[in-house]
């Protein structure tokens, strides 16, 4: 694996997706060292001059007015990390932990946090050695930063807590020792710089974005397959229709459908002069609905890319002016709203897919055997698979409720408005899994429907999608144990087998 040279503030979505998907060695751009060192010098000057500055020689939250003696500053930072590591729930997997750590490294290395280069390099060493801290998935409200998750991340630097090394959970000190690493001691402000920030919220939402992007592409292919299976018209994808409306997402979505449908299709030729005037909305309005979803994905991508490269701790060190300034960049409201928009898109992608599945079940609408199987009555075919899709799509409607409008005061009302961004992002994973299940059923159903079209072939790309599935799941001549087929189709979707048929979505 080639190392990623981290230029602070310049990470791309492609790089972040790679970090999420697989271990990625990091090298910090040497040009970042000067800004980091200057911010540390500013903090050290404040301590030496005995000036009062929040987070450097004061307490935190409601205790910000409490002045801390110089000889207690190291203990202050250690106590902060220990006390704030109060999360609950299942631990995050290695991929999520790695993404979160890289986001934190990227932010700290911008040089506005007053944290030593050696501490940043210690975090990089953990990533490179694949020593991952035990971080519970719950416990942050997304302001003042993701305190609990980032505290659990930071415990490992101190040799506290637990960590995973080579797939095994170990006491942190043991994991560090096995990896040839040593615990460190934090200096003034460094604990707060590590804990304060939106990196957990952003990592959660980024995973949702990456999964939504793949689901969108897969849904375009599945929708096109269904269009072919039920002898749907291609006229709704005509570029002129979408050009006169002018919605960019819709225009681009229609182009994606045209890309996979093309003009070379025996199925399309077979009903070119039929009497059917218009298709149901779940077919005809695919560009409009999916285009709106694409617009939401692109907006969320823009917000999350900015946040991935942001400095979001507090206070911030402006070394050129020799000032430490308190603000609120830790508030993850932009991330929460982006995650809420992603939730709407993921829910709608699944909801539209489920309606297409239902259409295929109805012999009057699809012109196919009931429930896509011969000898109906003896065979039930896709009857209950469609029910499963309906259950998943409906569940997502409840999960898509916005989190960004929720707030609950914390820290004795000092932190009286919060974003709930972590929960907003985390629920996207379950929603993505649900929509993947719906699309798996549609893929199975649409390919079965095309199989039943008397040997006619679809477009070249859709035939690839059909062949990919048929190499793993055979045609349904009679009823059989259905769940393993859905599971297999979901695995293929998760592996990006349909995504590869389209140009990049974002």
Curated annotation (Swiss-Prot):
Localization terms from the record: Cytoplasm
Disulfide cross-links: none
Main enzyme class: lyase
Single GO MF annotation: histidine ammonia-lyase activity
Keywords: Cytoplasm, Histidine metabolism, Lyase
Keyword Cytoplasm: yes
Domain of life according to the entry: Bacteria
Listed EC numbers: 4.3.1.3
GO (cellular component) term, any one: cytoplasm
NCBIfam families to which the protein is assigned, alphabetical: hutH, PRK09367.1
Protein name: Histidine ammonia-lyase
Organism expressing this protein natively: Enterobacter sp. (strain 638)
């Amino acid at each position: 694996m080639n190392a990623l040279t981290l230029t602070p503030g310049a990470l791309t979505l492609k790089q972040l997706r790679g970090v999420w998907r697989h271990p990625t060695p990091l090298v910090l751009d040497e040009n970042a060292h000067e800004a980091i060192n200057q911010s540390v010098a500013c903090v050290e000057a404040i301590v030496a001059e005995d000036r009062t500055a929040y987070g450097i020689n004061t307490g935190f939250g409601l205790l910000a007015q409490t002045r801390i003696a110089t000889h207690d500053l190291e203990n202050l930072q250690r106590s902060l990390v220990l006390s704030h590591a109060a999360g609950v729930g299942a631990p995050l997997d290695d991929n999520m932990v790695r993404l979160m750590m890289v986001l934190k490294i990227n932010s700290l290395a911008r040089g506005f946090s007053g944290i030593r280069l050696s501490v940043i390099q210690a975090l990089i060493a953990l990533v490179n050695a694949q020593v991952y801290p035990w971080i519970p998935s719950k416990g942050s409200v997304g302001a003042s930063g993701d305190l609990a998750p980032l505290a659990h991340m930071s415990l490992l630097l101190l040799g506290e807590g637990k960590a995973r090394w080579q797939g095994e959970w170990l006491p942190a000190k043991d994991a560090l020792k096995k990896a040839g690493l040593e615990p460190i001691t934090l200096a003034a402000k460094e604990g707060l710089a590590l804990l304060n920030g939106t990196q957990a919220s952003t990592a959660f939402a980024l995973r949702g974005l990456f999964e939504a992007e793949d689901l969108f592409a897969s849904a375009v292919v599945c929708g096109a397959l269904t269009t072919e299976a039920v002898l749907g018209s291609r006229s709704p994808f005509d570029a002129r229709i979408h050009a006169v409306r002018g919605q960019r997402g819709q225009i681009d979505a229609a182009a994606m459908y045209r890309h996979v449908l093309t003009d070379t299709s025996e199925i399309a030729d077979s009903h070119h002069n039929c009497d059917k005037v218009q298709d149901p909305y779940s077919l005809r309005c695919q560009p409009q609905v999916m285009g709106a979803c694409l617009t939401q994905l692109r907006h969320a991508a823009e917000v999350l890319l900015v946040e991935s490269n942001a400095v979001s701790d507090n206070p911030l060190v402006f070394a050129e002016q020799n000032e430490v300034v308190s603000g609120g960049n830790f508030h993850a409201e932009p991330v929460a709203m982006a995650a809420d928009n992603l939730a709407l898109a993921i829910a709608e992608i699944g909801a539209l897919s489920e309606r297409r599945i239902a259409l295929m079940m109805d012999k009057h609408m699809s012109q196919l055997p009931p429930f896509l199987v011969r000898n109906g009555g003896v065979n039930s075919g896709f009857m209950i698979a469609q029910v499963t899709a309906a259950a998943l799509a409906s569940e997502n409607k409840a999960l898509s409720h916005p989190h960004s409008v929720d707030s609950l005061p914390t820290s004795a009302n000092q932190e009286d408005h919060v974003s709930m961004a972590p929960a907003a992002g985390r629920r996207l994973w379950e929603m993505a899994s649900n929509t993947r299940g719906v699309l798996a059923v549609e893929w199975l159903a649409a390919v079965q429907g095309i199989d039943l079209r008397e040997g006619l072939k679809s477009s070249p790309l859709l035939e690839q999608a059909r062949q990919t599935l048929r190499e793993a799941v055979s045609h349904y001549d009679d009823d059989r144990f259905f769940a393993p087929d859905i599971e297999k189709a979901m695995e293929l979707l998760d592996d990006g087998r349909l995504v590869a048929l389209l140009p990049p979505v974002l």
